[in-house]
Amino acid sequence: DPDYRHLVKKIAGSNTIIHTIYKFKPGKTSNDEAWAKIGDVAAEVLPFIEKNFGKYPYPQYSFIQGGDGGMEYPMATLIHTSSLGTVIHEWLHSWYQMMLGTNESLYPWMDEGFTSYAEDLVTKFYYKRSSLQEYRDTLKNRPDNKTLKELVEHVLPEDHSGAYNSYFRLVQSGQEEALTTHS
């Protein structure tokens, strides 16, 4: 298909090949660069992933532009954009739930929970900094968030701080609502 580009990245020291298939946008080199970065990031993080979560047992993995966000399948992910967070998260589903074979409908925490935990560690490794540091720096300049600032500074474990990112964004947006449960 002339509207799509297919990039292939062989990961050094591994038998894994990364395929990136995306819609070509003439004149938008930033689009090409963003999608090309997926293979480079995969090559950088795979040794860390395999050291911490086990060897990737398949010969290839494909990131395919399509769908409406991110949806993992065996050896492939449909993603709408080249977001590295989504790329890493969906790829880690190859370990949690696919290799473990858990029933993601019956035990969603084993699927999304372990994947999100692993994503936080891999993302932190890739960016080589605490993902919470950005919030700490932002909150230091916002006296209206004193309670949240104290929480960030003294309570949260830095090693797994990325798991709190979505919640902090929600709190800072002013759109937070009370939790509703059936109980």
Locate predicted features:
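A broad structural signal for alpha-helix termini and local helix breaks/kinks
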Residues: 53-56, 96, 100, 126-127
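Post-HEXXH active-site segment of zinc metalloproteases
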Residues: 59-66, 71, 101-120, 125
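Short helix/strand-bridging catalytic loops that position acidic/His residues to coordinate divalent metals
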Residues: 78-80, 97-105
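Acidic/His/Gly-enriched intrinsically disordered linker/tail segments
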Residues: 112, 116-183
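Active-site recognition of the HExxH zinc-binding catalytic motif
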Residues: 49, 85-101, 112-116, 120
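Hydrophobic helix-coil surface modules that form long, contiguous segments used
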Residues: 1-88, 117, 165, 176-177
